[in-house]
Curated annotation (Swiss-Prot):
Lineage start: Bacteria, Pseudomonadati, Pseudomonadota, Gammaproteobacteria, Enterobacterales
Catalytic reaction list: 3-phenylpropanoate + NADH + O2 + H(+) = 3-(cis-5,6-dihydroxycyclohexa-1,3-dien-1-yl)propanoate + NAD(+); (E)-cinnamate + NADH + O2 + H(+) = (2E)-3-(cis-5,6-dihydroxycyclohexa-1,3-dien-1-yl)prop-2-enoate + NAD(+)
HAMAP family: HcaE
Protein origin, superkingdom: Bacteria
Protein's job: Part of the multicomponent 3-phenylpropionate dioxygenase. Converts 3-phenylpropionic acid (PP) and cinnamic acid (CI) into 3-phenylpropionate-dihydrodiol (PP-dihydrodiol) and cinnamic acid-dihydrodiol (CI-dihydrodiol), respectively.
Any Pfam family matching the protein: Ring_hydroxyl_A
Span of domain Rieske: 44-142
Organism of this sequence: Shigella boydii serotype 4 (strain Sb227)
Coiled-coil features, chain-numbered ranges: none
Name this protein carries in UniProt: 3-phenylpropionate/cinnamic acid dioxygenase subunit alpha
Cofactor(s) of this protein: Fe cation; [2Fe-2S] cluster
GO molecular function: 2 iron, 2 sulfur cluster binding; 3-phenylpropionate dioxygenase activity; iron ion binding
Length: 453
């Protein structure tokens, strides 16, 4: 069995000096350890409460590569179970979502209630004349399930910090999406799913820490949707400018702490500035006063930027796209993209949000394709022995971290930096090399203290 010491994790990651060895994106032994020590003990996004509003409603998803089913209980609580029959390991729930009174395995017909209990075994008296203790053979339950403002998370590790402690200061940034209006948020439409041939850490890192790429990777989109030859701005809808936000913002920051990351620009008006539909742009202006009252000016105006909750939950303010990077081996990720909107928005505005998110960040989105091409090409190159063992530079903004005095929390830097990437890989390494959560927390705290010296 390969151990963390065999893999020399801290020789692959040097966050103090800004170095990363890209073997972390290709090594199958590292990947197996990730499934155990990251996806097996971190809080992972499961579903939005709006997707399972009634008792018996269920939604099928994954925790790492483990299939799980999330179910609303009769008392309104939420449980999650390993989607695996206890008889021969067959899947017991196949539909993406729906409503049910029971889950029945198609192999031998064992049936489970929505509370996970084994309730029926075909031919039980004849097949098990010695008796079968059905209470012992219920579905394996995810022991830790908690919600944060509509987002449902699960964790296999009962020794992990609670969800709110795990989120830490990233919750302040997350609230900018979840808490703009009374009534919270909901998922609109279905789930878009597609596969990208890259390691899960590539998109997670980009959403945590990389605004820098947009100036170059998305240059063609900026040129097409940007200024006209005569110097005037093209318009997409009701008075919305398509000029890049980095040209119009008065300030910008990146947040990186506890493995999580976020980056955004300070703007002077509620303009999403990411080429959304005119109805969306108008909606942000019309609801700005309520958002400012609930969140304050900075977050109410924050309608662009990138975010990732470690390890794999990402979102983009303004475009209403929320996505999970489900790992499928060291060189493949399955993307699940949701459109998340204010519940109080009109049906017309919700449709405009869905259209905007799909156009820019759906599987054929004009920005999404740029990102996917980059990640796939990187993964191809890392098949080479020299390529996957050559150190990469992670020095942007090194030593420039600070804590702000304006109420914006956490360790921050200028938006064009790699503070969040270094923090993400530090938490990644700490998890892989630690036997307990307390050891992880101690290591992360020591790193963050060193960063802020």
């Amino acid at each position: 069995m390969t151990t963390p010491s065999d893999l020399n994790i801290y020789q692959l990651i040097d966050t103090q000096n800004g170095r990363v060895t890209p073997r972390i994106y290709t090594d199958p032994d590292i990947y197996q350890l990730e499934l155990e020590r990251i996806f097996g003990r971190c809080w992972l996004f499961l579903a939005h409460e709006s997707q399972i509003p009634k008792p018996g409603d269920f939604f099928n998803t994954y925790m790492g590569e483990d299939a799980v089913v999330v179910v609303r209980q009769k008392d309104g609580s939420i449980k999650a179970f390993l989607n695996q029959c206890r008889h021969r390991a067959m899947r017991v729930s196949y539909a993406d979502c729906g409503n049910t009174r029971a889950f029945t395995c198609p192999y031998h017909g064992w049936s489970y209630g929505i509370n996970g209990e084994l309730i029926d075994v075909p031919l039980e008296p004849r097949a098990y004349p010695q008796g079968l203790c059905k209470s012992h053979w219920g579905l394996n339950e995810v022991p830790c399930v908690e919600s944060y403002k509509g987002l449902i998370f699960g964790n296999w590790d009962t020794s992990a910090p609670g969800l709110r402690d795990y989120l830490g200061d990233i919750a302040w940034y997350l609230d900018g999406m979840l808490d703009r209006r009374e009534g919270g948020t909901e998922i609109v439409g279905g789930v878009q799913k597609w596969v990208i041939n890259c390691n899960w850490k590539s998109p997670a890192e980009q959403f945590a820490s990389d605004q820098y790429h947009a100036l170059f990777s998305h240059a063609s989109a900026v040129q097409v949707l940007g200024a006209k030859d005569d110097g005037s701005d093209k318009r997409l809808g009701d008075g919305q400018t398509a000029r890049p936000v980095w040209e119009t913002a008065k300030d910008a920051l990146q947040f990186g702490q506890d493995g999580h990351g976020s980056g955004f620009f300070f703007t002077e008006k509620p303009d999403a500035n990411v080429w959304v539909d005119g109805a969306v742009s108008s909606y942000y202006r019309e609801t700005y006063a309520e958002a400012e009252q609930r969140l304050g000016e900075v977050r109410a105006l924050r309608l662009a930027g990138h975010n990732n909750i470690f390890p794999t939950l990402s979102w983009l303010n303004g475009t209403a796209t929320l996505r999970v990077w489900h790992p499928r081996g060291p060189d493949q990720v399955e993307v699940w993209a949701f459109c998340i909107t204010d519940k109080a928005a009109s049906d017309e505005v919700k449709a405009a949000f869905e259209n905007s998110a799909t156009r820019a960040f759906g599987p054929a989105g004009f920005l999404e394709q740029d990102d996917s091409e980059n990640w796939c090409e990187i993964q191809k190159l890392l098949k080479g022995h020299r390529a996957r063992n050559s150190k990469l530079c992670l020095e942007m903004g090194l030593g420039q971290e600070k804590r702000r005095d304006d109420g914006i929390p956490g360790i921050t830097n200028y938006i064009f930096s790699e503070t969040a990437a270094r923090g993400m890989y530090q938490r990644w390494a700490d998890l892989l090399s630690s036997e307990s959560w307390q050891e992880v927390l101690d290591k992360t705290a020591a790193y963050q203290q060193e960063v802020m010296k």
